[in-house]
């Protein structure tokens, strides 16, 4: 493949072509799913009386105490409601909210049984959408891996999501949708925005 242009631009294109781009959106997506599960299980609560119409179960635990963790969750929920774009700047902001939510310290083995049961049921139903169709990753492994707070260094070749940002609500909704009412599935979003259902290249 041949590219012409300024050296800096060519270098950026080659990085995109090889997947040598940090996928900030992927971390924001995974942490968003984790916060969605934490809220659905009542581990985190909003600091205001909020009803999240696309998925009432997310705020069914009701209003919680005013704490740094719940304040961060409430702010994250606002971005979910607004369908914030997962560009690099927004992803860094969402990661900061995830850190403030204290989820990093809430490892699986320390969660109450009822919380784990709720998270397991929700995760199992959407594992194929959230972790890949062929994934058999146990929810405890997935949860603790996110708590380790490791940012992926590379992504797939020609990952268009690093160029044309996707949306937080779309990614939480998953490829097949069904989580957030009134929000497009990732399949519909990808085909409309990128013209393909898998907006990445393959080696």
Language-model region placement:
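Long, contiguous binding/interaction regions
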Residues: 2-203
């Amino acid at each position: 493949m041949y590219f012409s242009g300024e050296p800096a631009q060519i270098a950026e294109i080659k990085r995109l072509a090889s997947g040598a781009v940090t996928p900030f959106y992927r971390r924001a997506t995974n942490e968003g799913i984790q916060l969605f599960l934490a809220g659905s299980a009542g581990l985190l609560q909003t600091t205001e009386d909020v009803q999240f119409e696309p998925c009432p179960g997310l705020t069914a635990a009701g209003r919680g105490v005013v704490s740094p963790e719940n304040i961060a969750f409430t702010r994250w929920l606002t971005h979910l409601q607004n369908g914030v774009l997962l560009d690099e700047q927004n992803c860094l902001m969402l990661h900061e909210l995830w850190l403030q939510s204290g989820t990093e310290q809430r490892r699986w083995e320390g969660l109450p049984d009822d919380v784990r049961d709720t998270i397991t049921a929700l995760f199992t139903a959407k594992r194929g959408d959230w972790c890949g169709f062929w994934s058999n990753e146990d929810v405890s492994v997935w949860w603790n891996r996110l708590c380790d707070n490791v940012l992926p260094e590379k992504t797939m070749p020609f990952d268009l999501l690093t160029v044309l940002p996707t949306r937080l609500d779309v990614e939480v909704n998953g490829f097949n949708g069904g989580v957030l009412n009134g929000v497009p599935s990732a399949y519909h979003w990808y085909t409309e925005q990128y013209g393909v259902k898998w907006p990445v290249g393959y080696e």
